[in-house]
Amino acid sequence: MKLIPFPYPLNIGTDVVHLPRILRLINRPDYFHRFTRRILHEQEQRDFRTRFSLPPPSSGAEKTGLNPITPDMARWLAGRFAAKEAARKAAPAGASSLGWKDVIVRVGEADKGRPEIVYLDPMGCGETGGGRVGKLSISHDGDYVVATVLAAG
């Protein structure tokens, strides 16, 4: 049998996150803000603060522990974590070629509010710089969050 390669360079990545693991991490003393700064791009950090009505980092509230971590916050962060891991796996050069902040999860304006993954152009600045858009699906079920990314390579 003669095998014919698929005619389009497509890559797929999937990741599953156990929500209690994320909850354990972000509930550790002084780790919540460290975790969000580590995995979220600046735009995603702003989106997170806006979505959950959190004060800006300059307010000092993060040091006082005044912001209780809600299950919705944990679910949102777990979704971003899974999406970014899936995006890294779908990257044409492989997961090790991308850092956490090299990809952004954003809500697509033209696609009825569906989330999408953006591979940032290393020469761009993220928000105003260029990037490549990939398809993203995130699903939440009980203690698990799963994300799948389809990217052209």
UniProtKB/Swiss-Prot annotation:
One of its GO terms (molecular function) is magnesium ion binding. Keywords: Mitochondrion, Transferase. Its main location: mitochondrion. It is found in: Mitochondrion. Coiled coil: none annotated. GO terms for cellular component: mitochondrion. It is an enzyme of class 2 (transferase). One of its GO terms (biological process) is fatty acid biosynthetic process. It comes from the Eukaryota. Disruption phenotype: Essential for viability. Leads to swollen spores in heterokaryons with a low germination rate and arrest at this stage. InterPro entries: 4-PPantetheinyl_Trfase_dom, 4-PPantetheinyl_Trfase_dom_sf, ACPS. It catalyses: apo-[ACP] + CoA = holo-[ACP] + adenosine 3',5'-bisphosphate + H(+). Its EC number is 2.7.8.7. Pfam families: ACPS. The keyword Mitochondrion applies. Acyl-carrier-protein synthase transfers the 4'-phosphopantetheine moiety from coenzyme A to a Ser of an acyl-carrier-protein. The 4'-phosphopantetheine (4'-PPT) portion of CoA provides the essential prosthetic group for a number of carrier proteins and multi-domain enzymes, priming them for the acceptance of acyl building blocks in fatty acid synthesis and many aspects of secondary metabolism mediated by polyketide synthases (PKSs) and non-ribosomal peptide synthetases (NRPSs). PptB is specific for the mitochondrial acyl carrier protein acpA. Belongs to the P-Pant transferase superfamily. This is 4'-phosphopantetheinyl transferase B, mitochondrial. The lineage of its organism: Eukaryota, Fungi, Dikarya, Ascomycota, Pezizomycotina. The gene is pptB.
